[in-house]
UniProtKB/Swiss-Prot annotation:
Annotated InterPro entries: Galactose-bd-like_sf, PITH1-like, PITH_dom, PITH_dom_sf
Organism: Arabidopsis thaliana
Gene3D superfamilies assigned to the protein according to its UniProt record, in alphabetical order: PITH domain
Coiled coil: none
Name of the protein described by the UniProt record: PITH domain-containing protein At3g04780
Length: 176
């Protein structure tokens, strides 16, 4: 981790990248040649030549499950000045969302990204709304200029894990 990226992580929080369940990650309306791993996966998201791009219009709907319960504190999204995300809505523990029903649910939080945010400045979320997060849905509703394509260079999620017991690791005690 570079000194620059370490300084971006809010004090007392960690990058939640290692806690993402990659087998369940989905992104609706992504370009097939500019997909979500470009903005989310380690190594890819640090390469400014790679990005996630929307396909049919400016909206993106991203579903991120975690392999353990987390507390989400803040996020950082990097993107270009014109096509970078502007209105971003976050939904905690809402599965099976799609563009036809995303407006049926109130978001856990909404952020309006500024030019400074698009350079990687973290945005603090309503922490009380993200205490027991098993999955996160991110709805990028609009971009900075209203253009047809939204581009995201990096998505980073910051928070902490919740101490829980791994129920899969427990063994049944047999009666004798």
């Amino acid at each position: 981790m570079s000194a620059e990226s370490a300084s971006q992580i809010p004090k007392g929080q960690v990058d939640l990248l290692d806690f993402i369940d990659w087998s369940g990650v989905e992104c609706l309306n992504q370009s097939s040649s500019h997909s979500l791993p470009n903005a989310l996966k380690q190594g890819y998201r640090e390469d400014e030549g790679l990005n996630l791009e929307s396909d049919a219009d400016e909206q993106l709907l991203i579903y991120i499950p975690f392999n353990q319960v987390i507390k989400l504190h803040s996020f950082a999204i990097k993107g270009p000045e014109e096509e970078g995300p502007k209105t971003v809505k976050f939904f905690s523990n809402k599965e099976h969302m799609c563009f036809s029903n995303v407006n049926d649910f109130p978001p856990s939080d909404t952020a309006e990204l500024t030019e400074e945010n698009l350079k990687g400045k973290p945005v603090v979320l309503k922490y009380v709304k993200f205490q027991n997060v098993r999955s996160l849905t991110i709805f990028i509703e609009a971009n900075q200029s209203g253009s047809e394509v939204t581009k995201v260079q990096k998505i980073a999620l910051y928070g902490s894990t919740v101490e829980t017991t791994d129920m899969k690791g427990l063994k049944k005690i047999e009666d004798h």
